[in-house]
A protein has these predicted regions:
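Structured, non-membrane catalytic/scaffold regions adjacent to prosthetic-group chemistry
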Residues: 4-300
Length: 300
């Protein structure tokens, strides 16, 4: 089914609080996708030629039945609407009618082994299609130029490093605890707004974990592995003082450079409203028990 094809779903108009969904135009024109550009606007144009079909998602690691899924396999797992709040760590948010299926359905098919405790996700690595993965360009984005044109050694954040060991090494990697991954709210999205996912929003398949900051919701997923040890994510490696493994939305734990107590909600209004941020992005009744007894100021 082509990227603009309609899905058998009717986009919702509001969440459980009665807040309206973000206009599709805003959803497609504003966001973060560093694999393409550091700019928050213009991603659509840069990502327009990304090849998203055919696509394969390999699932392995500590599982009884490793498997490679194509897009038809994934869509056969069900495509239902999930209207979720999406809260960026940068203190802006959207309300998005995703279309997809609980990640648990896929994990049940491969049967995690008893020793599996975490799930590691990996995104597409293709610098020819994703110019932001070109280390020379990325080094310039973060404030310093490469030492050599071929970027065999780059100066990143003031430190001379080899691209292979750079704190900004691609591909993009994320992780969840297994119980988080198996939670009913955690989905793999194949569409949004009653259409297939656009390239700029993570096509053809992305993770959505609505109670966590949006950088956890990795885009263009090509590999999922069940593992025993906590994965080190892209941003944990790049900026560990700002990005923890859990990344639960928490108004009481400020970002080192700004408060997380409020957020700019994109609703298509002028001006856009500023709303109080809710613990776990408003999903505390469903997920707070997962972190019982944990110090969430340390496990951020």
């Amino acid at each position: 089914m082509p990227g603009g094809a309609k899905l058998p779903a009717d986009p919702g108009t509001a969440d459980e609080f009665g807040d309206p969904i973000t206009p599709l135009k805003k959803f497609r024109s504003y966001g973060n996708y560093y694999e393409f550009t550091r700019a928050k606007t213009g991603i659509r144009e840069v990502a327009a030629d990304l090849a998203t079909s055919p696509w394969q998602l390999e699932v392995g690691g500590l599982v009884r039945h490793p498997r490679v899924f194509d897009l038809d396999d994934l869509r056969r797992l069900g495509e239902e609407e999930h209207v979720y709040r999406m809260r960026c760590v940068e203190a802006w948010s959207m309300l998005v009618p995703w279309v997809g299926f609980p990640l648990s359905r896929l994990l049940d098919l491969v049967e995690p082994a008893p020793e599996a405790r975490f799930v590691r996700f990996e995104s597409l690595h293709d610098p020819q299609q994703m110019p932001g993965q070109d280390m020379a360009q990325f080094a310039q984005w973060v404030g310093s130029a490469p030492i050599a044109e071929d970027c065999q050694v780059c100066r990143v954040m003031g430190e001379t490093v080899d691209p292979a060991t750079s704190p900004y090494a691609w591909p993009y990697v994320e992780g969840l605890r297994l119980d988080e991954a198996m939670h009913d709210l955690t989905i793999l999205a194949t569409g949004a707004y009653d259409k297939r996912l656009p390239a700029e929003n993570g096509a053809p398949v992305r993770l959505v974990v609505p109670w966590k900051y949006a950088f956890k919701s990795i885009k263009a997923v090509v590999r999922i592995d069940l593992v025993e040890e906590m994965p080190t994510s892209f941003w944990m490696r790049a900026m560990p003082e700002e990005h923890g493994f859990y990344a639960n939305v928490n108004p009481d734990v400020p970002h080192p450079r700004w408060s997380q107590g409020r957020e700019l909600r994109f609703l298509g209004e002028d001006p856009e409203p500023i709303l109080p941020t809710l613990p776990f992005n408003g999903y505390a009744p469903q997920v707070a028990h997962l972190y019982e007894g944990m110090d969430l100021t340390v496990n951020f």
